Amino acid sequence: MTEEGKKDSEIVLEFLKDKKIDAFYCSPYKRSMDTIAEAAAFFTKEIITDERLREREKGSDGNNHGMFQKRWADHDYHEEGGESIAMVQNRNIEALNEILSDNTDKEIVIGTHGTALSTILNFYDNSFGCEDFLRIIDWMPYIIELDFEGDKLVGKQEHCHVEKEFKGKQRADKK
């Protein structure tokens, strides 16, 4: 893990350590697991990985501001070999609903990626779009609390983020 990754993991632990956490779920990608690993160890919990929480398959055209705008304007658009926003959203909501069903009245942590999280936020608030996505990919780690009653979102609060000079800003500057 890089020094920056270690600092990110410490930030997550510092935020969570006074909470009661029942379970940790995560994308199987190493960087997401590393970000929540220190907190999971603190709570003596295993990290349950779920392939559906992974990042979007980017395909042949890569990631640039124009492609971000195109994908968010048409959630069904995807380049060859890549996933659309709708595809990512479907698998993430399926995973989230299963996690919520298995953890009724429990406090859980989900470690995932910018696009994956953005599709979840868009599912519950369709005004969440490309500019919101670009904002949060510059804020990793980004801690947001979502409160559910069953599978219904009843509350949302941003708690913590680390603002970084990341690709979203660079891409936005290259409009």
Residue ranges with predicted function:
Residues 125-155:
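Domain-level recognition of soluble alpha/beta enzyme cores
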Residues 32-33, 116-118:
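Short, active-site-adjacent cap segments at secondary-structure transitions
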Residues 41-94:
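Phosphate-handling substructures
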Residues 156-175:
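Acidic, His/Gly-rich catalytic cores of divalent-metal-dependent hydrolytic chemistry
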Residues 106-115:
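Generic beta-sheet signal
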Residues 17-20, 99-107:
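Glycine-rich phosphate-binding loop signature in dinucleotide/nucleotide-binding domains
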Residues 1-47, 83-86, 140:
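Active-site-proximal alpha-helix that buttresses catalytic centers in soluble enzyme cores
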Residues 26-27, 90, 111-112:
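Short beta-strand scaffold positions
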